């Protein structure tokens, strides 16, 4: 056990990661040494930032807490704290079931942890925040919460209403990170395009991204988690006209069958969705679309699923993820629908839709062979440098593998000629 060391473990999404990074910054400003997701827990204090999105994520968070409770009982750690989405939603139950945790915090009051440890009463995250990602990219969370009430989604229950961060606060954070060496920014929110609505009733995401793009030193900006309904199309002008805004957009569509879209409370139709995709393709040629689909939602018929498969073949998404429906307590679907699609059918549909997408992705990546793409180097693994193009977000998208025949700098950009591809990745040589 290392005195003065705090080990922070983050479960779940990149929005949780940003919260962990902010907490690490506060700890370090008050004299602690922090590690993140260390393979070996050695700190006297451990903080688990939990996920409460779906059942598997909840169980993973609980299992992690229980492992650390055992470590505490064995004297390997002194203090154990829990924060994040799971404890935001189930704090009382967790306190009753796992009382060995020193204290539970929610998603928004984790700064109180410093006060409880006898540190400054109102700590502030001044200066560039600690980042746990490679030094050249960072996630920027522009809002909290969500006003969308999808029938299946527990996130609004956990995070509350949408609250936009002040624009100048976001811009200042990015300036500080640029000064510390960050070049690439992943702009994230539960609903990106809703930014500003809670401030004056208008969507200001296009203006915000344009202002970020104008900051000297910002090389790449990538946009995650938009929504098709009431999409602000002026954002496409910014993506098309600003060279440092990546031609990449992450929009969760979930389904295409009007039956499913209605039951899911998506407030968009099949026809509107297809028109939306066609307009994006037309207004920003070459843009790569990432989406997420949901199979096995209550009431999904074989016809609904076949319609979804045909839609995937038509849309030819460059990037796509999918997951099987999991009933979440407190949601509209859990309270009003019977979870009537058998688990084996959900899995079969999930496997099928991903197999269709894998073939599409392989064809799209193969078409890049022979082209020269600007690539940022993320790391070196064995005999290869691993990089990404503007069309690839960290962790979730294909990578570019470059044989390490010469020394390349991590965080630097290179023009890479693509020489080969497989089902997942590209291979290339520096020009």
Model-derived segments and spans:
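Terminal RNA-binding accessory module
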Residues: 333-431
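Short, electropositive alpha-helical surface patch
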Residues: 200-213, 233-247, 300-318, 342-348, ...
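Radical SAM/AdoMet-radical enzyme domain recognition
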Residues: 179, 206, 214-215, 220, ...
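Conserved glycine-rich "GG(E/T)P / GGGxP" loop and the immediately following alpha-helix
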Residues: 52-57, 182-211, 215, 227-234, ...
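Conserved, mostly hydrophobic/aromatic
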Residues: 150, 170, 187, 223, ...
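Conserved strand-turn element in the central/C-terminal portion of the radical SAM core barrel
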Residues: 11, 149, 153-160, 220-229, ...
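Proteins enriched for Cys/Gly/acidic motifs involved in redox and nucleic-acid/cofactor modification
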Residues: 1-195, 234, 245, 249, ...
